[in-house]
Amino acid sequence: MAKKPIKSASQRANVKKTLSVAVDPQVGFVRTEPAPLLPPPPSEGGFTGWLYKNIFASMSDFGSFGGATKSIFMGFVTLVLSYFLVTQTLALLDFAIFSAVWSDPKGLEREACWTVEQGGALPAGWHAACWPFIQAKAKFIFYGAYPSDELWRVNLAYLVGSVMLAWVMIERLPYRKIVGALLLTAYPVLATVLLTGGAFGISTGTIGVYTILSLALITMGRLGKAGYVSGALGDLASVAGVCGWVVILFAAVLAVFSVDFSLEAIDTRDWGGLLITLVVAITGIVASLPLGILLALGRRSDMPVARFLSTVFIEFWRGVPLITVLFMASVMLPLFMPEGVNFDMLLRALIGVTLFSAAYMAEVVRGGLQAIDKGQYEGADAVGLSYWQSMRLIILPQALTHVIPGIVNTFIGLFKDTALVSIVGIFDLLGAAQSTLADAAWSTPVQGLTGYLVVAVIFFIFCFGMSRYSMFMERKLSRSRNR
């Protein structure tokens, strides 16, 4: 209810008198200093508060029969789950750390992890991890059959990629955009040269043909931008200009691959373990996102041909299991190749995984595009932005922000799906670990469990890291939207 304004002189005098009494220091109930800050109740702060809010809050309602029944039931469920969690955690720690065998100083190999019943020195009933087995097979699990003298190349590729990725992720560092651009363009070329040895035998004539083609396409794009052609031909010229820059980058990559770096050539059949897992996962992640964005835009396009082709592509790849794609790429594709043409097995798997993941990524991005209000499109048209300008500056940034969880979920699924390449003869991390189990020199009842534990921990580290970083990006972008 609104207060009435003070008009008369007597009313103003009464107010002044009241105020003078209120601020009189002789009045005992008037506080002259701020009240001290009291600590929060135990149920609201600290570890006790966390326990109450997340565990005990659902078990403290005994004011009614229904509330008491619910509290008792939730308490029973909490006790059962807590018991299961504690016992399984202790069992895992005992298997992996407390009771595990950590070294084999006498070189006994499998006998180092044998019990007395099996002819070893460990007590009867011992069942824990055999880490000497992992130490002996670490090179194959992490690098495959890559030559030992050339492992520095793999480690250098890991180091450069990790430093550049960390540089991009840490906000306080300068030149993050430049480092990010180099990570997406120059680093793949560097990693390919280091891992394969370079010198692919590409002729100068081939590079010249691509260079001339790129210059022609760029010239067409310039003509369209200058207004010499208009309408549909103008749009086609603009697309040709963009393709020209892509072709000239491809020509530059071919020029680098034609240089002899005096490195030993390593066939991809010698790659394996964690190296293969990272190559397949990173290639699929980096290539599937832009391809998925283009497919999502094509499916929502007003052009019937683009919409039809994008829809057919997405529905085809989503309707086929990944293992079928890998089998087709490894077994059936060579049958359709010309005589004498040999397509690298790993490259075939990379193409199949990328196309498969791009179809799922397209649907995730399309969901983000549908979440954008129509007014955003109308606002972009009102300020005179072209289709690609509105997509790049207004629509896509908002759409991708909305679907960060879906994008990262697809990335995590792709990372775990790399284990399927072992079925077609490519030894990824899981395949390499499984192949080491056939070594009779390390045949023990626990070598399989130890190997699978290592693989599970590695997969968990990468997947959990991606999940946490996506949560960080969500919080960061949410704060920027709410400001």
Give, region by region, the residue ranges found by the protein language model.
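Transmembrane alpha-helices and adjacent helix-loop boundaries
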Residues: N14-R483
